[in-house]
């Protein structure tokens, strides 16, 4: 036996250290771990690879509008489980869960404010709430925002990010596609501008309705934009898909997106567009 024996270092029970949640985030673009405060200060754009991460609706509004000019509308509207949907978890339980995690009653914040001196009606979807799927409340709030813009003769800006129609509401969800599109048709008849901003991801029923109807359609870099997912299309058509299929860059090359704008330049670009539309307002 050895004369001197080095005692093993034992970890004290129950003292395992963990990194507090919310302090760091792993970038989906480059895989690097980035401090959350650094992402917030950089408008949720990765400082390492420039990947545009999902941005909470409240932060987006703050970055776009002039300070202290935003007035929220219909903040008290919230979804109800009309169909009594049951799955792995009930629709009611899911709504409660996402309300607790985001502080939102549903997946969009709407209102009006001033952008570089121009009055605008604005709706910003928040992917953190049930993948920003469009149910009856989301569709109603967006429709009311469009109607506010029409009544007050101001531009409408909608920042979209969505997984599509909300299956928990069935046909009530699908009819929002027609309702929002109809409101935009009335807005267009008054010769008033609508600027659509597509972020990552914008898909399915949202892309097939109001998100693709802008007078000017802007997309953020590398955003996934489309209707059905690549796997579904591949299995349905039995064909290989083009490289970069359903990316903002691919859609711009094929004329479905007017411009790709970095998030930090988005406010200035929208302001420039509004200056062209001034004669209409």
Locations of the language-model features?
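N-terminal alpha-helical interaction blocks
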Residues: 1-15
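N-terminal hydrophobic/helix-forming segments and targeting peptides
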Residues: 14-18, 35
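Residues immediately within or flanking Cys/His clusters that coordinate Zn2+
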Residues: 24, 43
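Short cysteine-rich clusters marking metal-coordination/redox-active sites
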Residues: 27-30, 46-49
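Cys/His-rich microdomains that often coordinate metals
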Residues: 33-34, 52-53
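Long, charge-rich boundary regions
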Residues: 55-132
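Cleft-lining beta-strand/loop regions that shape enzyme active-site pockets
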Residues: 107-188, 195
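Conserved catalytic cores of soluble enzyme domains
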Residues: 162-281
């Amino acid at each position: 036996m050895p004369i001197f024996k080095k005692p093993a270092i034992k970890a004290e029970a129950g003292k395992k250290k963990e990194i507090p949640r919310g302090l760091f985030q792993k970038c989906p673009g480059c895989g690097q771990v980035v401090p959350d405060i650094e992402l917030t200060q950089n408008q949720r754009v990765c400082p390492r690879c420039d990947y545009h991460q999902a941005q909470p609706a409240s932060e987006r509004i703050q970055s776009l509008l002039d300070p202290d000019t935003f007035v929220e509308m219909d903040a008290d509207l919230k979804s109800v489980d009309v169909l009594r949907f049951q799955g792995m978890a009930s629709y009611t339980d899911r709504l409660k869960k996402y309300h607790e995690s985001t502080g939102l009653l549903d997946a969009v914040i709407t209102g009006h404010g001033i952008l570089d001196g121009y009055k605008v009606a604005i709706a910003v979807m928040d992917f953190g709430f049930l993948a920003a799927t469009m149910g009856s409340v989301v569709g109603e709030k967006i429709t009311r925002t469009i109607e506010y813009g029409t009544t007050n003769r101001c531009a409408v800006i909608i920042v979209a990010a969505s997984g599509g129609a909300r299956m928990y509401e069935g046909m009530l969800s699908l009819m929002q596609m027609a309702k929002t599109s109809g409101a935009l048709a009335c807005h267009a008849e008054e010769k008033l501008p609508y600027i659509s901003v597509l972020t990552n991801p914008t898909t399915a029923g949202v892309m097939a309705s109001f998100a693709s109807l802008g007078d000017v359609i802007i997309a953020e870099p590398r955003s996934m934009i489309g209707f059905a997912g690549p796997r579904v299309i591949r299995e349905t058509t039995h064909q290989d898909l083009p490289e970069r299929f359903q990316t903002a860059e691919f859609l711009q090359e094929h004329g479905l997106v007017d411009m790709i704008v970095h998030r930090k330049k988005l406010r200035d670009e929208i302001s420039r567009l509004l200056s062209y539309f001034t004669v209409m307002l």
